[in-house]
């Protein structure tokens, strides 16, 4: 690992101590005394510094975060996938001092004991509505809004707009009722998160390495008679055994289900010659993958091979263009129009010829698509990490090719970190 100086990286400037001619590391999971791996204090310090920088360049006085990815980014705390859709945890960060964290019941006590980087006086238990299960009339939203207003006054930023990423409507109304001006805080947090430190890049590389291994297991097991749901179960087992902390979703799509892409899995049984594609969405220490691969069952047809070749060409031309200073509209223009591969318009084809940032969230900046990039181009910068994905249905209707590569933007191009073989259509258990 490089000896990064967070002060050099707050604005997204990669440390001059990093030698990009070296491979990006994918070390083991254990902490060891004989080599440097992830420096978690440095990681947390970088993320707080980036958030402070993003706040300073915004018009906000503070951000109030209910999005678990933002909470983890600011506080270095997590209580698992269970909380992702509950909107029950929240954090407040003014940029003038350390963050406040309200966590679910006893988790607050746990953080005071086991998370020494957090100020124990700022680790509080909190509860709101649990997506409406607790009615507004219970008074928890009002109580929380009043407490937040008092803290903002103490920090000297109560007269400035408060950025909020996501929240339940009663919480929004309660914040407005105490006189706070509410604005979109998600954009500020995305500003902070779009440039990764080398610790984050190594974690993303390790996350991809876990999926490399899962695809090896998929390839060995992909045979006639096995079902899509069985492959999802196998991949989930392999991922958790390898250190994944959250298998968010695995798409397993095959045969006639490939076109149009349904974005799910079923109990369909694989048959000889099927084209099958998978998307593995999981995280290692919070850092996610979005990693498609297409494999055929035993054999392939000329139409399937042609579909794969075209999808590969589309992704390769995009990868070749990735470098600092490039804009997303130029990459999107290299991809086919929706009508060229069977869709009525770009909205229906959204997500098929696609690029998106990956980090603590599955979709970060930049977003690359013919739907949005022409009207709102975005400049690519060193230190961004994003996925590029393409899709092409087979001309005979028997399958479709789906490929995705994650790339790290370097000073003179990019580095691919998704390494399971994909230059040619992979035939599993050829016969």
Annotate each predicted stretch with a short phrase.
Residues 1-431:
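Active-site neighborhoods and metal-handling regions in enzymes and metal-associated proteins
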């Amino acid at each position: 690992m490089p000896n990064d100086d967070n002060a050099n990286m707050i604005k997204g400037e990669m440390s001059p101590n990093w030698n990009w001619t070296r491979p990006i590391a994918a070390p083991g999971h254990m902490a060891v005394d004989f080599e440097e791996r992830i420096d978690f204090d440095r990681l947390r310090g970088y993320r707080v510094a980036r958030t402070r920088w993003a706040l300073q360049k915004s018009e906000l006085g503070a951000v109030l975060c209910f999005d678990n990815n933002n909470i983890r980014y600011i506080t270095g705390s997590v209580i698992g996938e269970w909380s992702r859709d509950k909107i029950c945890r929240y954090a407040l960060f003014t940029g003038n001092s350390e963050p406040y964290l309200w966590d679910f019941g006893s988790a607050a006590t746990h953080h005071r004991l086991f998370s020494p980087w957090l100020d124990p006086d700022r680790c509080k238990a909190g509860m709101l509505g649990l997506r409406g299960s607790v009615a507004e009339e219970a008074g928890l939203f009002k109580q929380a809004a009043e407490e937040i207003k008092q803290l903002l006054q103490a920090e000297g930023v109560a007269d400035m707009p408060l950025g909020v990423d996501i929240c339940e409507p009663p919480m929004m109304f309660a914040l407005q009722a105490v006189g706070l001006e509410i604005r979109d805080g998600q954009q500020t947090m995305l500003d902070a998160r779009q440039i990764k430190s080398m610790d984050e890049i190594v974690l993303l590389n390790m996350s991809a390495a876990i999926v490399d291994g899962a695809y090896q297991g998929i390839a060995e097991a992909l045979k006639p008679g096995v079902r899509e749901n069985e492959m999802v179960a196998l991949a989930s087992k392999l991922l958790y055994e390898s250190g994944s902390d959250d298998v968010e979703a695995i798409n397993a799509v095959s045969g006639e289900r490939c076109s149009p892409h349904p974005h799910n899995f079923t109990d369909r049984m694989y048959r000889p010659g099927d084209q099958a594609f998978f998307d593995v969405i999981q995280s290692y220490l919070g850092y996610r993958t979005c990693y498609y691969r297409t494999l055929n069952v035993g054999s392939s047809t000329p139409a399937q091979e042609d579909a794969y070749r075209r999808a590969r060409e589309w992704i390769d031309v995009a990868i070749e263009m990735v470098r600092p200073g490039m804009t997303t509209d130029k990459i999107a223009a290299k991809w086919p129009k929706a009508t060229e591969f069977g869709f009525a318009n770009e909205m229906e084809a959204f997500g098929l010829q696609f690029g998106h940032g990956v980090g603590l969230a599955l979709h970060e900046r930049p977003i690359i698509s013919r739907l949005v990039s022409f009207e709102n181009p975005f400049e690519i910068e060193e230190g961004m990490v994003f996925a590029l994905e393409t899709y092409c249905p087979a001309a005979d209707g028997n399958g479709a090719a789906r490929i995705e590569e994650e790339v790290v933007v370097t000073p003179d191009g990019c580095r691919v970190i998704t390494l399971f073989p994909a230059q040619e259509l992979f035939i599993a258990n050829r016969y």
